[in-house]
């Protein structure tokens, strides 16, 4: 089977969606699937991340994501940023289909990551599978109905069928439990944090991730926990503003901005912490939470999107209301000042991640979806002949 994955930003940024598709591509290849990944680079720029783990083609097209993430929440820019995002995806998708159509060996399935137009713009009759990490803009609902299958997990798997008016296949994510394990190298000593109580977040620094809320919580927390320290792993257009916020809140010396860290190295950063925090406005089913669980950390997270799937029962973490820095600070304090409770929660998280989340199992479910859409399109072609 030949599968072509369209992952728009794989060469430009690494969030949960990009990480997931790399993991899928590796596992599918191990299961005997011939995988090609198509990603994009700017017309005049270069790739920011190497794409060398899987066979990949990088296509040049206008890249608007930096503009979108910087301005999407500013007053008066909403419509402009949505238009820019639409044009970005549309032009990349057209270029990808031209590449697919010209290939000497056609793809059996095209699997697009959150590229809503992928089925509408298809060349020929190749089946199209689209995975969705959250609620689509209303303008794309008719496009999504043209896909041969929609897949999702978390919040999206529960809510999208009503939005798009068709079934959505649930394909849960996985985690590399060998890489993300409690024992192994740590950055704590190198960062001079041996005697600190450390909170970590791993996120793109974009408005949706709301990392400013976590900085505000740490500003409140340091009055109650004298040696608290925050590690922020990730980069993005809000990095400078967040650094200024830490200065304004008087906690610049208690916050480390690590910038981008290769995904293969993030486990060592997780191991440097005592608790993981997520402060997003919305997160469908965040990879970073699952990776922190696998490392054996307790979780404190805003009760948004699909995060509840991981910590709803309270055994491995605590959910707090969104945009409430006092509640976030209080929940973090509970784990930072009670090592036994933190260890027990982390152990339960490690056990659950090991038992329930496997990239191999996730990839096998994908293959089942691919086989179904190939068979269904073949039946449709025979019926119309």
Label the predicted regions:
Residues 243-261:
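Nucleotide-activated donor-binding/catalytic signature segment of Leloir-type glycosyltransferases, i.e.
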Residues 181-193, 379:
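A short helix/loop element that forms part of the nucleotide-sugar donor recognition site in Leloir-type
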Residues 260-261, 268-273:
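Short alpha-helical donor nucleotide-sugar binding micro-motif in glycosyltransferases
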Residues 313-314, 318-326, 334-339:
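Conserved acidic donor-binding segment of nucleotide-sugar-dependent glycosyltransferases
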Residues 298-301, 311:
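Short hydrophobic beta-strand element within catalytic cores of glycosyltransferases
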Residues 129-182:
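Donor nucleotide-sugar binding/catalytic pocket of nucleotide-sugar-dependent glycosyltransferases
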Residues 281:
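Aromatic "clamp/platform" in nucleotide-sugar-dependent glycosyltransferases that forms part
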Residues 19, 23, 197-225, 230, ...:
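A conserved mid-protein helix/loop that constitutes part of the nucleotide-sugar donor-binding site
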């Amino acid at each position: 089977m030949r599968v072509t994955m369209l992952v728009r930003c794989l060469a430009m940024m690494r969030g949960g969606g990009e990480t997931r598709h790399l993991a899928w591509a590796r596992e599918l290849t191990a299961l005997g699937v011939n995988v090609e990944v198509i990603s994009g680079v700017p017309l005049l720029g270069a790739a920011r991340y190497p794409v060398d783990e899987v066979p990949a083609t990088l296509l040049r097209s206008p890249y608007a994501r930096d503009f979108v993430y910087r301005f999407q929440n500013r007053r008066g820019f909403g419509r402009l940023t949505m238009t820019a995002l639409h044009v970005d995806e549309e032009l990349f998708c057209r270029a990808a289909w031209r590449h697919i159509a010209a290939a000497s060996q056609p793809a059996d399935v095209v699997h697009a990551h959150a590229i809503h137009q992928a089925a509408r713009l298809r060349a020929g009759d190749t089946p199209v599978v689209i995975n969705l990490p959250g609620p689509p803009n209303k303008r794309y609902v008719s496009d999504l109905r043209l896909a041969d299958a929609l897949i999702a997990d978390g919040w999206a798997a529960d809510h999208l069928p009503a939005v798009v008016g068709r079934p959505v296949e649930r394909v849960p994510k996985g985690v590399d439990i060998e890489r993300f394990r409690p024992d192994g190298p740590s950055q704590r000593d190198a960062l001079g944090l041996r005697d600190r109580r450390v909170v970590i977040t791993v996120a793109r620094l974009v408005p949706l991730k709301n990392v400013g809320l976590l900085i505000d919580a740490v500003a409140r927390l340091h009055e109650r926990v004298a040696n608290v320290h925050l590690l922020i792993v990730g980069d993005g257009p809000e990095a400078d503003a967040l650094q200024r916020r830490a200065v304004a809140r008087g906690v610049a010396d208690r916050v480390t901005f690590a910038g981008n860290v290769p995904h293969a190295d993030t486990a060592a950063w997780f191991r440097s912490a005592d608790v993981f925090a997520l402060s997003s406005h919305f997160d469908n089913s965040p990879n970073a939470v699952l990776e922190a669980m696998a490392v054996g950390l307790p979780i404190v997270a805003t009760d948004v999107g699909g995060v509840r799937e991981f910590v709803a029962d309270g055994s491995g973490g605590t959910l707090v209301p969104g945009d409430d820095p006092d509640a976030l600070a209080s929940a973090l304090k509970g784990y930072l000042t009670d090592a036994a409770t933190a260890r027990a929660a982390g152990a339960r998280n490690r056990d659950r991640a090991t038992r329930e989340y496997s990239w191999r199992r996730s990839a096998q479910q994908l293959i089942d979806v691919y086989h179904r859409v190939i068979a269904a399109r073949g039946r449709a072609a025979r019926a119309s002949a």
